[in-house]
């Protein structure tokens, strides 16, 4: 018999608006015993059926909705349908942007909560981030093999958020060949190397594709500083755009080594590229002291906000680092500044940049706004899916 979760009175409004999460505080009672991740039916306080989802007893998100259709079962066929729906959109994006690497499944926004799947050529890279996703692992992999028989599957569920779901970290080969140490993919005419096994996230930041193209369009004749460069995709884009010099800064020598390989792979002028292993905050202060100036600065830091308690400190960090960047720009220079923190609202991030400009003593115009690329959609009922935000700021 299916386990039933009943919401407290008045707590059904978010589900009626088709938001896919049920928080622990909204739960009145659970009838029956469910394993972690098992499929349950969700009802309002009067017993009306609302949704079918995955139960997660150890998480603040007590249930994640698989479907709002009462007759839809959660099985292999369900995952095949979801994959096919997602692929229809990715086919269009891949053709438009010349891609062989893209996000295939973006969790809740593709109706598959807690599941991230990136495709790099014929390798599918999984991240199963919730108890429900882990519980459905076998069904999902069977569905992937049905839809993508040509693809190997690799698991990168080595993500700390799994601990909040009571899950161990997981990584390794699932189906087919191991990915090579570095796998080349293509976007907007660039070739970029992906480290699936050891790289950040699933190996590469696919979400910044549109921003990399924007950087290319701003680069002609400019001296560029690429902060938190990782494997240098922004640097390659800047060189393709005709920059006079690009300096890439990261704390990881391994990432900088791949960045250099990316420049060489695209047969670009290596003499225009410099790779600096350093702390970005310290280097920006040193550059300010030395009187260094740039015409384009790319500021793409890692996530500063992991929970709401860190938001105030993150605001200070974002303001300080962007203030330093703005002080290094020539008049007419451009700062492309990003936040990948889902807990950082777009309007607050824009205010932080405005405050940074005041503290830097620079008059700044906002000229463009960015978000994650189109293969990272945001379903209308789940605004939390919009996590990446960015602005192009022009110094007057």
Curated annotation (Swiss-Prot):
Keywords: Cytoplasm, Methyltransferase, RNA-binding, rRNA processing, S-adenosyl-L-methionine, Transferase. Its EC number is 2.1.1.191. SMART domains: PUA (SM00359). Its main location: cytoplasm. Specifically methylates the cytosine at position 1962 (m5C1962) of 23S rRNA. GO terms for molecular function: RNA binding; rRNA (cytosine) methyltransferase activity. It holds the Pfam family Methyltrans_SAM. The keyword ATP-binding does not apply. Belongs to the methyltransferase superfamily. RlmI family. One of its GO terms (cellular component) is cytoplasm. This is Ribosomal RNA large subunit methyltransferase I. It is an enzyme of class 2 (transferase). Signal peptide: none annotated. It comes from the Bacteria. Residues 2-81 form the PUA domain. The keyword Nucleotide-binding does not apply. It is found in: Cytoplasm. It catalyses: cytidine(1962) in 23S rRNA + S-adenosyl-L-methionine = 5-methylcytidine(1962) in 23S rRNA + S-adenosyl-L-homocysteine + H(+).
């Amino acid at each position: 018999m299916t386990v039933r979760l009943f919401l407290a009175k008045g707590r059904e409004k978010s589900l009626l608006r088709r938001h896919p999460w049920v928080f622990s505080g909204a739960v009145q009672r659970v009838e029956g015993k469910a394993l972690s991740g098992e499929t349950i039916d969700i009802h309002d306080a009067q017993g009306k059926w609302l949704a079918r989802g995955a139960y997660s007893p150890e998480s603040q998100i007590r249930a994640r909705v698989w479907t709002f259709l009462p007759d839809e079962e959660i099985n292999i066929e369900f995952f095949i349908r979801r994959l096919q729906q997602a692929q229809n959109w990715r086919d269009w994006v891949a053709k438009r942007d010349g891609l062989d690497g893209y996000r295939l499944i973006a969790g809740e926004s593709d109706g598959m909560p807690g599941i991230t799947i990136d495709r790099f050529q014929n390798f599918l890279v999984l991240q199963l981030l919730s108890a429900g996703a882990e519980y459905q692992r076998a069904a999902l992999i069977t569905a992937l093999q049905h839809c993508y028989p040509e693809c190997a599957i690799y698991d990168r569920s080595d993500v700390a958020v799994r601990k909040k779901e009571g899950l161990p970290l997981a990584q390794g080969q699932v189906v087919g060949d191991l990915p090579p140490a570095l796998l080349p993919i293509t976007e907007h005419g660039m070739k970029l190397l992906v480290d699936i096994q050891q790289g950040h996230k699933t190996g590469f930041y696919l979400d910044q594709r549109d921003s990399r193209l924007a950087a290319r369009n701003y680069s002609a004749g400019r001296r560029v500083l690429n902060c938190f460069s990782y494997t240098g995709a922004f640097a390659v884009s800047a060189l393709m755009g005709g920059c006079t010099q690009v300096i890439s800064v990261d704390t990881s020598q391994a990432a900088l080594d791949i960045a250099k390989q990316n420049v060489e792979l695209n047969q670009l002028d290596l003499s225009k590229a410099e790779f600096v292993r350093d702390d970005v905050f310290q280097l920006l202060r040193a550059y300010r002291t030395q009187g260094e100036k740039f015409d384009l600065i790319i500021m793409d830091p890692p996530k500063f906000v992991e929970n709401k308690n860190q938001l105030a400190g993150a605001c200070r960090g974002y303001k300080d680092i962007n203030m330093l960047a703005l002080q290094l720009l020539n008049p007419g220079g451009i700062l492309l500044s990003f936040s990948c923190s889902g807990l950082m609202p777009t309007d607050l991030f824009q205010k932080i940049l405005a405050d940074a400009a005041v503290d830097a003593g620079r008059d700044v115009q906002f000229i463009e706004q960015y978000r994650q690329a189109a293969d990272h959609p945001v379903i209308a009922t789940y605004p939390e899916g919009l996590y990446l935000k960015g602005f192009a700021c022009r110094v007057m």
